[in-house]
Amino acid sequence: MAEGGGGSRRRAPALLEAARARYESLHISDDVFGESGPDSGGNPFYSTSAASRSSSAASSDDERERPAPPGTAPPSYAADPLELEEDETGGGWSAVLRDRPSPRFEDTGGPTRKMPPSASAVDFFQLFVPDNVLKNMVVQTNMYARKFQERFGSDGAWVEVTLAEMKAFLGYVISTSVSHCESVLSIWSGGFYSNRSLALVMSQARFEKILKYFHVVAFRSSQTTHGLYKVQPFLDSLQSGFDAAFRPSQTQVLHEPLIDEDPVFIATCTERELRKRKKRKFSLWVRQCSSTGFIIQIYVHLKEGGGPDGLDALKNKPQLHSMVARSLCRNAAGKNYIIFTGPSITSLNLFEEFEKQGIYCCGLLSSRKSDCTGLPPSMLTNPATPLARGQHQIRTKGNMSLICWYNKGHFRFLTNAYSPVQKGVIIKRRSGEIPCPLAVEAFAAHLSYICRYDDKYSKYFISHKPNKTWQQVFWFAISIAVNNAYILYKMSDAYHVKKYSRAQFGERLVRELLGLEDSSPAH
């Protein structure tokens, strides 16, 4: 039997220092946005998606803490011999633990291009949205305007858009990520959200005309069946920019980022306004570097309508999420990445498939939300004997370890990235240190960082809410591009010339796109 005792909550200083040193690579951590605020870092198993957050208890089968009596060691848990025999003979799972090293990773993560100290906010943004992409938007928008007027009648007020106007148009919409005002037209309103310096660059009437005809892809080709055909070329271009500009660290996270409504807006919205709003028809998944927060890859899944990938025919959520994971990791093979996953993605079959490709995983497991095929049943049910905080059981099969760890509830993990023998510790400000396997410590550290990042980064999503799905996807993608640009800025020499917070960087980017600022952050 593999088991661990809770022991004293206070560990030796050397163990705590070693635990902290293991995650020094989370080097821009809380300061990633140059400001502090409340976050969700206190809960290492917090889920970043609203849907998952509402059912986060699914990952733990018992939220009641059962502490050991004061002054006594936590009770050991003895597995039933019949259960142990079933595990070993039924599916190849064993209670024998063997140490093994974590996957080697020799690549150097970070920006691939050294930006000069004089690089401006727009220089970083245009690593992902360069002029050739903007020029294509100009061509497609003008083409759509001509065809629209051929069909519905001439628009005497329309003049073909230029590259400078397209940049200004993007700048106006991006400004809503800083002002947190849902209506971009408020810039010209004269009210609280008005901005005279921005309003003078372009008239409201001209902005509304560009908004009316704005397109990334004007027309569907005869071979196109994808529901996102109007934005997919831009997503592909954005992905190429991400790949070219940044090399991720070894540890990464697959999840749904926070892209739900601004809680401040919801709190001030009338019931009628809320009823009029349409729910999103898509879900957005990302693969994210857990050391920096840089989003490496985006996957958009349409919730309605058919598609060539056949995802809409899938009714089983774990199966759907496994396909999403495969898509997000299609460029990750052979690099010994360690991918952290939530319960809906975690499964033995997927992890074994990824291991054959040189991708290793560590995932939170839920008997209700995960695909538990091939896992020993005795490890998926709570033991009859209460466990003390920090106690755990482990079963292994090849390189795979199934962990059941107790901390105010039973948490289960599946991993082939960490040795089942290596020990770790969860450091809590109030309750001290809680012993755990190294895989649990790693999961908590990296997921907590991503949660803190998302709590802050979600504040800077573009607030403009178009009705068309492809436009919603487009502006969410632009929001991600701006956040990624800020991360590259913080890792560059330009940050040491002028240290902008995330809000200041956004304001600077808007003014540069509108042509109101010099391109050098030194001025």
Swiss-Prot record:
Q: What is its main location?
A: nucleus
Query: In which residue ranges is the amino acid composition biased (Low complexity)?
Result: 47-59
Give one GO molecular function term.
Answer: endonuclease activity
Q: Which UniProt keywords apply?
A: Endonuclease, Hydrolase, Nuclease, Nucleus, Phosphoprotein, Transposition
Q: In which tissues is it expressed?
A: Expressed in the brain (at protein level).
EC number, UniProt record: 3.1.-.-
Region described as Disordered: 30-116
Q: Where is the composition biased (Basic and acidic residues)?
A: 97-107
- One GO BP annotation of this record: non-replicative DNA transposition
Q: Known InterPro entries for this protein?
A: PGBD (IPR029526), PGBD5 (IPR042423)
Location in the cell reads:
Nucleus
Q: What would be one Gene Ontology cellular-component term for the protein? A: nucleus
Q: Does the keyword Transport apply?
A: no
Q: Which residues carry this modification: Phosphoserine?
A: 520
Q: State what this protein does.
A: Transposase that mediates sequence-specific genomic rearrangements.
Report further notes: Has been domesticated very early in vertebrate evolution, approximately 500 million years ago, in the common ancestor of cephalochordates and vertebrates.
Protein name in UniProt: PiggyBac transposable element-derived protein 5
Protein species of origin: Mus musculus (Mouse)
